[in-house]
């Protein structure tokens, strides 16, 4: 029996911290696939965080394929799969730390996003909506907010569906 071809789909889930974005993304992925992929973009910076990541992986269950990738999402072939990418904010951070020039970091992120989403898969991106809290007095934070906001806009412009969690 021929395998049914997945139609490429991009979904962006945005909202504030602790708004239920990740839980919603995971539920959605589970509805769409019996064996979804979870791509974590977080950099593991200490043992406590490592334990937290392991706890999250165990809570998701054995049907999930867990991938840790800080920057180069396109290195992973997820053709035909449903993937949660959690999260865009940390992914942007990983680029910004290495390239604090916002325009260059943004261009690198857009290129990587386009390479990654060229695959025939369902992509569920989770991001923080950081633009609703006012302007930071800190110049580095303002630059990062610009990067994050512009990347969110870019993903939203490519998305088939955008969900705001409140």
Please provide the spans of the model-predicted regions.
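Short, Lys/Arg-enriched N-terminal segments with co-localized hydrophobic residues
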Residues: 1-6
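Conserved P-loop
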Residues: 8-77
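Structural motif
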Residues: 12, 82-84, 124-126
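Glycine-rich phosphate-binding loop signature in dinucleotide/nucleotide-binding domains
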Residues: 32, 77-81, 118-120
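Short, well-ordered beta-strand core segments
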Residues: 36, 83, 161-164
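Helix-adjacent hinge/juxtasegments
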Residues: 62-108
């Amino acid at each position: 029996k021929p395998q049914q071809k997945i139609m490429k789909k991009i979904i962006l889930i945005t909202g504030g911290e602790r708004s239920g974005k990740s839980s919603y993304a995971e539920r959605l992925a589970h509805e769409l696939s019996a064996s979804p992929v979870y791509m974590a973009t977080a950099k593991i910076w200490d043992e406590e965080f490592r334990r937290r990541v392991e706890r999250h992986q165990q809570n998701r269950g054995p049907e999930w394929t867990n991938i840790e990738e800080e920057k180069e999402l396109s290195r992973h072939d997820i053709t035909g799969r449903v993937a949660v990418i959690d999260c865009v904010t940390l992914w942007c951070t990983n680029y910004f730390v290495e390239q604090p020039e916002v325009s260059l970091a943004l261009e690198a992120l857009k290129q990587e996003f386009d390479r990654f989403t060229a695959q025939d898969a369902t992509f569920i991106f989770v991001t923080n909506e950081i633009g609703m809290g006012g302007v930071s007095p800190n110049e580095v934070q303002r630059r990062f907010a610009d990067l994050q906001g512009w990347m969110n806009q870019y993903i939203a412009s490519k998305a088939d569906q955008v969900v705001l969690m409140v």
